[in-house]
């Protein structure tokens, strides 16, 4: 290569280098200036790939009635922003109304805003530097606090309320129910009614043969169940120990059961033949119904013996002349035409005890004294 050619190359390179250096700064300076000098463009046109400046383009937009998914999102965003603005304005108006009502009621004037320290932040209040202005107490007991961010005054204050201290709830006593306090006891059992056994007799009248040496002027009654029904006719008492009762020593009085036969209406046929202290016997003179009457009488005696709740006899019972008793001596003579007295075995002396009465149809009632 000639020296002249090398000198020309140097000159060309020297001439081109300043131009290149001048071009590079121009390209680097356009990049940061674009965001600063960029004017707002239409969002609808931008969604469709068209760049149009927003100034004077609101009525001339070609995609103003477009309903694609991108344009629908733009509409929803505008509606949300409009609702936020309306809510903020409503809160500001409500806060001003509450403040005016508090001042009219004579509340204390608002104090100067105080700076909240970082260590004195209460729970429930967001952290940060906000100006807290105490407000008058509301009727419900909550103390409203107005938080105003220091850098954003245009959004308006936010109204917060602190819950009041825990107060005891009003207690209403429950009215007493049907069951009172304490241990409940069931009501006492009532006395069962007396066992009633009715025996029908169809035979003519037969006189009664009592024990010898008994007084007919003594009557036996039931004090708890009231007096027995007064019926015309003769009444008789038979005293005989039941099977299974303790007899005891011979020198002590025997505890026996007394069978009282009370007749109602016309006198019926009845023949009582007392036996020894160890047994008792009822002799009936009726023919066809003798076995039936004996069976019913035996069932009545067993039921009376098993009865555990029977009334007690009182010794101070007034005598009744209508009763023909066999408990005392000096019995009356037999009526004319009758069979008379038939004493068999030694007399029995009853002791006070319980008694249960049985009504026997035309014959009357049977009472067992134990």
UniProtKB/Swiss-Prot annotation:
Its main location: nucleus. SUPFAM superfamilies: Cysteine-rich DNA binding domain, (DM domain) (SSF82927). This is Doublesex- and mab-3-related transcription factor C2. Keywords: Differentiation, DNA-binding, Metal-binding, Nucleus, Sexual differentiation, Transcription, Transcription regulation, Zinc. It is found in: Nucleus. May be involved in sexual development. Expressed in testis. Highly expressed in ovary. GO terms for cellular component: nucleus; XY body. Residues 1-38, 334-356 are annotated as: Disordered. One of its GO terms (molecular function) is metal ion binding. It comes from Mus musculus (Mouse). GO terms for biological process: heterochromatin organization; male meiosis I; regulation of DNA-templated transcription; sex differentiation; spermatid nucleus elongation. Belongs to the DMRT family. Residues 42-89 bind DNA. The keyword Zinc-finger does not apply.
């Amino acid at each position: 290569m000639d020296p002249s050619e090398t000198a020309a190359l140097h000159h060309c390179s020297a001439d081109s280098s300043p131009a290149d250096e001048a071009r590079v700064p121009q390209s680097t300076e356009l990049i940061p200036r674009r965001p600063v000098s960029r004017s707002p463009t239409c969002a609808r046109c931008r969604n469709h790939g068209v760049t149009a400046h927003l100034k004077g383009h609101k009525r001339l937009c070609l995609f103003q009635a477009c309903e694609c998914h991108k344009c629908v999102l733009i509409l929803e965003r505008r509606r949300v922003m409009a609702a936020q603005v309306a809510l903020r304005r409503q809160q500001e108006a409500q806060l001003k109304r509450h403040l005016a009502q508090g001042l009219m009621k004579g509340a204390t004037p608002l104090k100067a805003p105080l700076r909240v320290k970082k260590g004195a932040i209460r729970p429930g209040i967001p952290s940060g530097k906000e100006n807290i202005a105490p407000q008058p107490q509301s009727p419900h007991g909550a103390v409203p606090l107005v938080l105003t961010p220091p850098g954003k005054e245009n959004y308006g204050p936010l109204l917060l309320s602190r819950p009041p201290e825990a107060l005891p709830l009003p207690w209403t006593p429950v009215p007493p129910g049907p069951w009172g306090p304490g241990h409940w006891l069931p009501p006492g059992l009532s006395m069962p009614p007396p066992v009633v056994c009715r025996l029908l007799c169809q035979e003519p009248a037969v006189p009664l043969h009592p024990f010898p040496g008994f007084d007919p002027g003594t009557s036996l009654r039931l004090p708890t169940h009231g007096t027995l029904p007064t019926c015309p006719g003769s009444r008789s008492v038979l005293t005989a120990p039941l099977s299974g009762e303790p007899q005891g020593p011979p020198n002590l009085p025997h505890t026996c059961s007394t069978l009282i036969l009370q007749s109602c209406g016309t006198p019926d046929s009845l023949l009582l033949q007392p036996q020894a202290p160890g047994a008792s016997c009822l002799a009936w003179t009726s023919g066809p119904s003798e076995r039936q009457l004996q069976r019913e009488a035996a069932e009545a005696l067993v039921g009376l013996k098993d009865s555990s709740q029977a009334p007690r006899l009182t010794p101070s019972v007034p005598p009744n002349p209508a009763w023909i008793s066999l408990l005392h001596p000096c019995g009356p003579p037999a009526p004319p035409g009758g069979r008379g007295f038939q004493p068999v075995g030694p007399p029995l002396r009853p002791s006070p005890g319980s008694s249960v009465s049985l009504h026997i149809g035309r014959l009357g009632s049977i009472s067992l004294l134990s």
